[in-house]
């Protein structure tokens, strides 16, 4: 059941649509969808239709999936991009480099959320593998000597709940990982490699209670910072920022947090946070009008324990739907690394619709 008691004033100049004073009380979601669909059918594609969809999202973000159902089945795969800057990258031309078909130890539905790290001359990529048998995400591993050709190794981390977004990093000669734990409500857990890259142990909970998605940690001027989507509603992300002196905490919420509230275009983290030449770049996934639409970049101009300011890099997204099948639906993740020659390499993911 859904209760709407707001007056709505929406003028779409394209069709001169005036949708004013509508009240919907105790209506089934299917009935609301029928009303919304009747307007969307005669609104021409373009800005007017997008405005109407955004209005519906703002009015009831928690019910958006019921009002505007999306029957798209997304199949994700992993690719590699290269370029001169971390937010100016191009398809290397032989993508995807990893798909569900490469996974040989579990029946995989798709692969996504890649993070990589170089150790002893070898690239190690960790990523989400959705296991068809358990219908949960597990963390897989692939390796490469050149960042081009990748060989799947095995599943390296499983839990009784869904895992994804395996944010891997190195600190003081130790390898750590912060995977997302889905909607299990177990907080943000920190893992340490006991035998890198295949064996991992949870060493602590750095944030507890509630749902935390796509947690992204980085170190800046002697402190650890962590972005996370703390919304209880996946369709309406809430970007919170925390800081700590020590990796295991205690973690404190930043005075400027929440950084972004309720904006599906720029709130949810979309990959590794970069700190290069005293510049901080955060990537965000655009989850509107569908999950996995685009990736945008923001440069953080000011960050201290009490202040925060950022600006978007460019006017357009840095990643989006491609012209070939593997990422024709959209893209939602990036992990960029600088090479010895100053160029950049990134593992990314994209998706296409399947029946």
Question: Would you name each region that the model predicts?
Answer:
Residues 7, 15-16:
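Polybasic, lysine-rich low-complexity intrinsically disordered segments
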Residues 25-355:
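Carbohydrate-active catalytic/glycan-binding domains of CAZyme proteins
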